A protein has these predicted regions:
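Well-ordered alpha/beta subsegment
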Residues: 110, 119-121, 135
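Short, charge-patterned binding micro-sites
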Residues: 44-52, 93-97
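A common structural junction motif
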Residues: 123-131
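Conserved small/polar residues in nucleotide/adenosyl-binding loops
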Residues: 149-156
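Compact, glycine-rich, soluble single-domain proteins
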Residues: 55-93
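N-terminal small/polar-rich segments of proteins
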Residues: 3-41, 45-47
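Short proline/glycine- and acidic-rich turn/helix-capping motifs at secondary-structure junctions
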Residues: 135-145
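Mid-chain, well-packed structural core segment of small domains
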Residues: 82-113
Length: 156
């Protein structure tokens, strides 16, 4: 895994782009859990099928200069919005095979409710705002899914 390019707020935010491999547990170990009573995690995996077709792989491309700043901004917004204490998140780029992790999000919080809310919000916003594009390669052919990234935020 690539070293973190963003550690903010005295270690409260860890953001990574993972071009070769994503180890969700190693990322979770980097989450600052001081004063936390809950850690909520989400790990997205490549499905084995899409409709009737077998998935051979997903290929993710990212706007390299913008990915880390967008993820950092989302993590900071989650801390502010939900009152959680820390966020660690990473997204794969490159080729990802079936059942391999694509994205990992870990949220540390004094209480579980806020951690669950923040984690759900983070994956939803990541899919809307992160400059990442996905090509699905299946036994039926190849399809680009450009709906992962809709538009840059005016703050970016």
């Amino acid at each position: 895994m690539m070293p973190s390019t963003g550690i903010l707020m005295a270690g409260r935010v860890v953001v990574e782009e993972a071009p070769d491999v994503l180890n969700p547990e190693a990322l979770r170990q980097r989450l600052n859990t001081n004063d936390c009573g809950a850690v909520v995690s989400f790990v997205g995996l490549t499905r084995e099928t899409e409709g009737a077709a077998d998935v051979l792989r997903l290929e993710f491309d990212a706007w390299q200069d913008r990915l880390t700043p967008v993820l950092e901004r989302l993590a900071l917004e989650a801390i502010k919005r939900f009152g959680v204490l820390s966020v660690a998140m990473a997204h794969r780029t490159g080729s990802v095979g079936p059942q391999e992790p694509i994205v990992a999000i870990h949220v540390g919080s004094p209480h579980r409710k806020e951690a669950f809310q923040a984690c759900e919000w983070l994956i939803d916003e990541l899919k809307k705002q992160a400059p990442i594009w996905k090509k699905e390669v299946t036994t039926d052919g190849e399809t680009w899914n450009c709906l992962l990234y809709t538009s840059p935020s005016p703050r970016d």
